[in-house]
Amino acid sequence: MLLGDIGGKHIAFFYKRPSVAIITWRPILGFSCCFQLWGEVRLNQTVNRRVTIRMLLL
């Protein structure tokens, strides 16, 4: 799961595996944040094909 607050300042990556990463990021716009995050997610999937990520924008 990927969670972001309304301002998009705090983003947490939760994987189905026990590994958990929390990233603090300040995007300009929520939609641009969404596209940039999808880019990061695709890179992560390229590195780890076993990891499946679901994104929720709050």
UniProtKB/Swiss-Prot annotation:
Note: This virus depends on tobacco mosaic virus for its replication.
UniProt lineage: Viruses, Riboviria, Virtovirus, Tobacco virtovirus 1
Top-rank lineage group of the source organism: Viruses
Organism the protein comes from: Satellite tobacco mosaic virus (STMV)
Protein name: 6.8 kDa protein
